[in-house]
Amino acid sequence: HPNALCAGSSEIYIWFKHIQQMYQFGPYGPNHATAGTFAFKRELLKTTKYQEEAALAEEKAFLKDYTIPFVQLEPKKTILVFSHIHNTFDKKKLLEQGENKVQKCSTRTVDEFIKQDDLKKFYSEEIDDLLKNYEPGDPKHKPDVLKQIVEIEERRKKHNQVNSNSRIILNNNGKDIELNN
């Protein structure tokens, strides 16, 4: 695309092995994508960069509040995320939120994403045992990530409290009617 400086996928799929279930996350917006799906022109680096201190959730700043000219990639051809013990962010925490408009169970299968049997076997059966013995990848060795996860969770909790306390009042012929958020 001639006008787009960056491409990526705002819709991603995560395979949760512990429950044998695929989940769809997103899409979140036309100029949004997960950093692991980015492909961008060198020209983009003249106007933006990753924040050195950001250990996760770096997309918003890099994409300048999602204003960078952008093209969406086909999710099935872009990435399949496997939830595992050394994920930078424990993907299982996402399931605690329950389903909503940007997070839902999917009928897609691992076979739709990965055609090679040896790769399917590696990601589905072998990776967890290998990661158990890979001490440097343990999240406890990523203090900056752990700190930022706590900060993000606190901001999200505060945001949810503020929004749950807000009320919308409709005045209908002199009678106030509270609308549910």
Regions found by a protein language model. Give the residues of each.
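Short, high-confidence coil segments that cap the C-terminus of an alpha-helix
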Residues: 2-5, 68, 76
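Short, P/G- and charge-enriched loop/turn segments at secondary-structure junctions
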Residues: 23-30
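A conserved hydrophobic position in a structured secondary element of the catalytic/binding core
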Residues: 40, 58, 73
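Active-site donor/metal-binding and catalytic loop motifs
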Residues: 14, 75-104
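Conserved donor NDP-sugar-binding/catalytic core segment of glycosyltransferases
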Residues: 1-23
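Terminal low-complexity segments of carbohydrate-biosynthetic enzymes
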Residues: 107-181
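Conserved nucleotide-sugar donor-binding
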Residues: 32-49
